[in-house]
Amino acid sequence: MGVLGGPSPRLRLYVYDFKEPGGEAERRKLRELLESHGAFRLQYSTYALLAEPEVHARVLRRVVARVDFEEGDSLIVVPMCRRCLRVARWVDAEGVRGLRF
């Protein structure tokens, strides 16, 4: 089975939002936690992490334990299956292209 196959996709997107003003300390904690597990930034509040399901579970447990979410703050974790990756598109000044991980 391929890197991204199986019932538990290894690639997940972590998309977060913290209200303004404030929230910078929690935003920083979350960024550092994600980066310490090998996640890389796609956009300002969006990270991608290619890891085993156990790592994703550990990341989520640590987020809950270490990040203080207040009313209006959120984190969405989105599993990306093979089909999702095939149809996903990145649009920027260079045009439209598929995602590569």
Curated annotation (Swiss-Prot):
The name this protein goes by in its record: CRISPR-associated endoribonuclease Cas2
GO molecular-function terms, A-Z: metal ion binding; RNA endonuclease activity
Protein residues bound to Mg(2+): D17
Record-linked InterPro entries: CRISPR_associated_Cas2, Virulence_VapD/CRISPR_Cas2
Subunit structure: Homodimer, forms a heterotetramer with a Cas1 homodimer.
Keyword annotations from UniProtKB, A to Z: Antiviral defense, Endonuclease, Hydrolase, Magnesium, Metal-binding, Nuclease
Gene of this entry: cas2
Function as written in the Swiss-Prot or TrEMBL entry: CRISPR (clustered regularly interspaced short palindromic repeat), is an adaptive immune system that provides protection against mobile genetic elements (viruses, transposable elements and conjugative plasmids). CRISPR clusters contain sequences complementary to antecedent mobile elements and target invading nucleic acids. CRISPR clusters are transcribed and processed into CRISPR RNA (crRNA). Functions as a ssRNA-specific endoribonuclease. Involved in the integration of spacer DNA into the CRISPR cassette.
Entry's transmembrane regions: none
Gene3D superfamilies in UniProt: 3.30.70.240
Organism lineage: Archaea, Methanobacteriati, Methanobacteriota, Methanomada group, Methanopyri
Family: Belongs to the CRISPR-associated endoribonuclease Cas2 protein family.
Cofactor section: Mg(2+)
Residues annotated as signal peptide: none
Species, as recorded: Methanopyrus kandleri (strain AV19 / DSM 6324 / JCM 9639 / NBRC 100938)
GO biological process: defense response to virus; maintenance of CRISPR repeat elements
EC assignment: 3.1.-.-
Pfam families assigned: CRISPR_Cas2
